[in-house]
């Protein structure tokens, strides 16, 4: 299966498919960003194992939901051939909805151009591992045009043997700022243990910002000096 999200360099059409031939009555709603980092939404109907193309160019995929649960995995991806409903080029996959689930929020999110986000808390839950092991969660931020930086590292011990771990870290006294066009990402790593299931939830305060273009009138130096001279005569 795919492990990382590879961003497109420019907006492109998305495709959807299922790994089960019987998934033909469900629809896939995709929320993401276009080349201008504006929010766009598109709904595409599934046709089982066959890939179905959308009509809008997506630069980013932030959220995917289904109209009803499916019997197979649902893939959202850029152009790729498929085999039994699975994209042949997994680097094109932007999101996967697991069998029986209704949604798939990636552990990565690009902020729209007219928004600022403030991370106030994170909650993590894990279970299903066969042995105890250390878990490390890393929260990274990538500013527009810059490299990724790690803002917070969370370490805890999963006890394994079907134990359930539930923890929360609060940033409400000093929220972490994610400006427009920046990327929020969570990565998880572990030492030992197998078959762990990890859930992660981030809480944000959203701030709308004004992105209306403004016009500035510029005059040359000679005209500016003449205008100042005229003002001087008027004042005298």
What does each model-found stretch correspond to?
Residues 1-60, 67-235:
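Beta-strand-centric surfaces of beta-sandwich/beta-rich domains
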């Amino acid at each position: 299966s795919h492990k990382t999200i590879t961003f497109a360099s420019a907006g492109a059409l998305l495709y959807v498919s299922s790994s089960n031939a019987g998934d033909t009555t469900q629809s896939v709603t995709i929320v993401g960003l276009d080349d201008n980092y504006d929010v766009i939404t598109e709904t595409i109907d599934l046709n089982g194992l066959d890939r179905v193309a959308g009509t809008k160019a997506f630069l980013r995929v932030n959220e995917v939901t289904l109209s009803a649960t499916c019997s197979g995995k649902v893939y959202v991806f850029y152009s790729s051939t498929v085999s039994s409903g699975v994209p042949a080029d997994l680097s094109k996959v932007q999101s996967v909805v697991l069998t029986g689930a209704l949604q798939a929020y990636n552990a990565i999110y690009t902020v729209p151009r007219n928004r600022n986000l403030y991370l106030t808390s994170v909650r993590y839950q894990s279970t299903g591992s066969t042995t105890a092991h250390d878990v490390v969660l890393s929260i990274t931020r990538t500013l527009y045009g810059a490299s990724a930086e790690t803002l917070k590292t969370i370490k805890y011990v999963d006890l394994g043997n079907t134990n359930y771990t539930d923890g929360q870290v609060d940033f409400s006294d000093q929220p972490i700022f994610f400006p427009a066009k920046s990327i929020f990402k969570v990565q998880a790593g572990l030492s030992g243990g197998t078959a762990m299931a990890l859930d992660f939830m981030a809480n944000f305060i959203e701030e709308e910002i004004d992105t209306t273009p403004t016009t500035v009138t510029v005059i040359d130096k000679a005209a500016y000096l003449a205008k100042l001279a005229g003002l001087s005569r008027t004042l005298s």
